[in-house]
Swiss-Prot record:
InterPro entries: Ribosomal_bL34, Ribosomal_bL34_CS. PANTHER family: LARGE RIBOSOMAL SUBUNIT PROTEIN BL34M, MITOCHONDRIAL RIBOSOMAL PROTEIN 34 FAMILY MEMBER. Keywords: Ribonucleoprotein, Ribosomal protein. It comes from the Bacteria. This is Large ribosomal subunit protein bL34.
Length: 44
């Protein structure tokens, strides 16, 4: 049976990367929450 997760770095960056997050208001909110929490890595 084929697994559902077939990792691809480009797709990962495009979907969950910093620039993708900054593109939308909700994405910027995610980054701000993660900054407030003190996350070492903000995005994928």
């Amino acid at each position: 049976m084929k697994r559902t997760f077939q990792p691809k770095n480009l797709k990962r960056k495009r979907t969950h990367g910093f620039r993708a997050r900054m593109r939308t208001q909700g994405g910027r909110a995610i980054i701000n929450r993660r900054r407030a929490k003190g996350r070492k890595r903000l995005t994928a």
